[in-house]
Amino acid sequence: MLECKSRAWMEIDTTKIAHNVEEIRKLIPKKTKIMAIVKANAYGHGDVVISKELIKCGVDFFGVSSVDEAISLREAGITCDILILGYTPPMHFHYVLEHNLIQTFFSLEYAQKAAAFAQSQQTMMRGHVKIDTGMSRLGVICQDHEYHIDDVLRIYTMAGLQVEGIFSHFSVSDDLSKKNELYTKHQIILFDRVLADVKKAGIHPGVTHLQNSYGILNYPELAYDYVRPGLLFLGVTSNDALEIRTNPSFLPIMQLKANVSLVKTIQPNVSVSYGRNYCSKDVRKIATVSIGYADGYPRAVSNIGAEVLIHGQRATIIGNICMDQLMIDVTHIDQVKEGDVVTLIGEDQGAFLAVDELTRWAKTINNDTLCFFKGRVPRIYKSE
């Protein structure tokens, strides 16, 4: 891939990461550390580059979704602890051992398989126990309707396992409505109950962690050993319209750009793009932009009023977004020409178009939007 500004590209300013990490640290207790979640290629930003920058900021623990993501970091020379948050197929347990990774043990049965494999290799597998306090996804169920503390204790004492920590995950920490605030607080109570019962059994629980990004923003006073931010060190939240309890000042590190490939004038009653969903009412000047849904720009925002920036002004996307291209109306903007830069996320001559706007047009969350953008869009990093 061309490591340069091609037909479409991302510009990622890694110098802003240190500021964002410091904003996180201002929110949490001094003794609490950061486990940076860099899954999904660091939400599309580039996991290796972002992780190395975070290490410069004092981050010493990473979380990923899968064993292959963890191996990618190891092969790039990252030696910090790495927690695999998701499922590793038993046939791939050997990678966990070979690369000194930490596996999540999310059920008694799964932990038994991990322990059996480790014993067959005459070693121990490192891991953290996952507790289901209300997400009903992965984790040993420890809720009001079922409370399987015996399974948790058996995992801790299982031959072949080296359990180094325990964690759970909030499901609605982003929602401060009374109903969901009570739900989140009950998750905290359940997690603390598990910790107390583990200690009561004479077992040290190891490192503890519960807060995701919104757990940090809305419940910063919690004093577990680690917090698990993902989007925050990238300078964004899942939804900037949500009320939060704190007032951090994060700096978005990513911009999305593309080139104009052609400018043309069309007459009245001329259709644009597939499906003929847009038809001009009068003479219009349109520009074709060299980015499309194969690059990750969502087709769902076709012809609904979504905008981009060019020459510091907003231009509307017209017609259906194509696989490799989209069209914009630039009738009101002077001197648009081939090669001009279009900003789809970011800043242009003092104007700003946030990822949140694209997210709202696409009716999703920023986590999803940032993961849209595919590998064929080069990432251009600014590091000084």
Where would I find each of the regions flagged by the language model?
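Active-site anion/phosphate-binding pocket segments in diverse small-molecule metabolic enzymes
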Residues: 2-14, 18, 69, 88, ...
